[in-house]
Each structure stands twice: as structure tokens, then as C-alpha cells.
Amino acid sequence: MRVGLGYDVHKLGYNTPLILGGVNIPFNKGLIGHSDADVLVHAIMDALLGALSLGDIGKHFPPSDMKYKNISSLKLLNYVSNLIKSKGYSIGNIDSTIIAEEPKLFPYIPDMRLNIAKILKVNTSIISVKATTEEGLGFTGKKEGIAAQSICLLYNNLKHSIDL
């Protein structure tokens, strides 16, 4: 078994969509970044990569590389999913939290879970997504950005093998 922890944050700005978990959320602001700035999917990818000591998303998808400009983070998640499978691992579960003062995200969480589960080819029952606020504190509380945290558990599929 391997455990990974991921974290991501992006600044909120105007004239850009708000995409979380691959869901386009109606809001007057969006997240600014090189890709689609989906902090939830970015945190999940960092957790998965970290569990296998494979670096982070900046290593695999450098912001200096224009082929990742405005790319859907779900496409990047598909790459990470294939990478962990190629190493002989499968996902036990993923637990994530989005930290945002607004908008209210509860209505969109089922679609986020479904999008992530489809890409990872797992049941939605092992994908947890929650949303919380910071009660007006910090940059998320001041509505300057959105953050996400994720933790994952990976299982080694290879019988009688030594963990990485």
C-alpha cells in the first residue's frame, strides 16, 4: 500500500471559466492558470504521483510547455492514471476537499465525482469530494482563490512483489 497527499491553489480572476472536477461551474470568476486551473484534479494528480514518488504535476506537465496551455486537467489525469497502472498499482480510494468561500459547490459534487471516476476507471464509491469554507479567513476566505487537498491510497497489484 502507498499513500499520497496533494494540494493545489489558484487565484480567482475574471473572464475565465471556473472548472472543478471537470465541471464548468457558473460563476462570475474563474481560476487562473496555464491549464484549465482545475485545483481539484491537480490535487488528486499530485496525490497519485506522490504516492509512488513520481514527482508532481509541474514535473510531468511543465507550465513552460505550450502543449499544456488551456488543456483539460481530466486529460492530464488520464495520463497519470495510465502511469500508476503501468507501475502495477490500483486506486483504493481518494478523499478530497475543495476550500472556497464561494460559489456553493454542493450541487456540483456528484458530477465531479463521476468525471474523476470515469477517467480513473473506478467506481464513484471510492471517490470522495467535499467542499468547505475558511469562514472568511485567509486568501480563500477573502475570495482571492480556491484551494484543494487530496489524499489517496494505492494498492500494489503484483503478487509477491516488493513495493517500488
Swiss-Prot record:
Keyword field: Isoprene biosynthesis, Lyase, Metal-binding
Cofactor note: Binds 1 divalent metal cation per subunit.
UniProt: 4-CDP-2-C-methyl-D-erythritol 2-phosphate binding residues: 8-10, 34-35, 56-58, 132-135, 139, 142
Broadest EC class assigned to this enzyme: lyase
UniProt xrefs under Gene3D superfamilies: 2-C-methyl-D-erythritol 2,4-cyclodiphosphate synthase
EC number(s) from the headed UniProt entry: 4.6.1.12
Physiological role: Involved in the biosynthesis of isopentenyl diphosphate (IPP) and dimethylallyl diphosphate (DMAPP), two major building blocks of isoprenoid compounds. Catalyzes the conversion of 4-diphosphocytidyl-2-C-methyl-D-erythritol 2-phosphate (CDP-ME2P) to 2-C-methyl-D-erythritol 2,4-cyclodiphosphate (ME-CPP) with a corresponding release of cytidine 5-monophosphate (CMP).
Protein name, entry field: 2-C-methyl-D-erythritol 2,4-cyclodiphosphate synthase
